[in-house]
Amino acid sequence: MRYSVIIPVYNRPDEVDELLQSLTEQSFKDFEVVIVEDCSSIPCKEVVDTYQDKLDIHYYNKPNSGPGQTRNYGAERSAGEYLIILDSDCILPAGYLAAIEKELQASPADAFGGPDRAHESFTDIQKAINYSMTSFFTTGGIRGGKKKMDKFYPRSFNMGVKRDVYAALGGFSKMRFGEDIDFSIRIFKGGYRCRLFPDAWVYHKRRTDLKKFFKQVHNSGIARINLYKKYPESLKVVHLLPATFTLGVAVLLLGTPFCLYSLTPIALYALLVCIDSSIQNRSLHIGIYSIAASFIQLIGYGTGFWRAWWNRCILGKDEFEAFKKNFYK
């Protein structure tokens, strides 16, 4: 078996259906699918059963333990030479696995990851969120962009790793947020060959509304400090930008009663985002939504970063995450 596709799932049967359908359309066929349900209240077993005669597919249900441990559970029960880790809210183009195989044949790698895109069927909000998570003007290009301010770290929505490397590293940690970056850091620290496969991209839905998106990025900001406490050298300038942006916006807003021109930098940045997103998505409507998504992405991450910095670096508290009771709902 060449590839095992590991998919952790929590309350997303409809998305699993779309992902499995896209797996049936792959031009490269030497793979199995391992679905691991993380104690969902809305299980996807009935959906999985409809693909038993179309895919080499295996379904498991286990007590809730978060995405990292759920991936480990699936990896232990898989058979592939390479493990492909995907989020359940992804849809694959027909040439996805073929693109991975082509890259590995051209130049072997121990681990790899690919970028993400927005499918034409996604809502305008989803496309705006996709822009905010992939644009150089919001992330510095660190999530697989051609322009980037830091090296590429594979992320769990689209990641691959050799089975023996996965085993040697002990799989994902027990972190509920940032566990994929933790894993990628350990890949590089272990001296393994790891790189971006630019043509192995996926359509990634992410969060479907701005409230859920804020919760996600806020926890990402918290996770960055949790990672810093484990790996101090992992904190780079690009990771400080959302926190700096958040502080800058707060200062400028506080200055508004004294000088209306203090809003100018905020307005110019919003205009830049709107123009860039409108051009990329060919839609002014999405461009306007992208302003909201980008500010939520930066401020959500920034406030999470500052919150964790205060609690962990100043008060000396233990690792934590926010919205623990309802984040997965």
Regions found by a protein language model. Name each.
Residues 245-315:
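Membrane-embedded multi-pass helical conduit in multi-pass membrane proteins
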Residues 83:
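Short aromatic/hydrophobic "clamp" motif used to bind/position activated sugar donors
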Residues 173-235:
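Catalytic donor/gating beta->alpha subdomain of glycosyltransferases that bind UDP-sugars
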Residues 20-65:
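Acidic donor-binding segment of Leloir-type glycosyltransferases
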Residues 62-78, 99, 149, 153-157:
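Glycine-rich, basic loop-to-helix element that forms the pyrophosphate-binding segment
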Residues 95-127, 200-201, 205:
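Conserved donor NDP-sugar-binding/catalytic core segment of glycosyltransferases
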Residues 42-43, 90-103, 185:
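Acidic donor-binding/catalytic loop of UDP-sugar-dependent glycosyltransferases
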Residues 1-25:
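N-proximal low-complexity "stem/linker" segments adjacent to membrane-targeting elements
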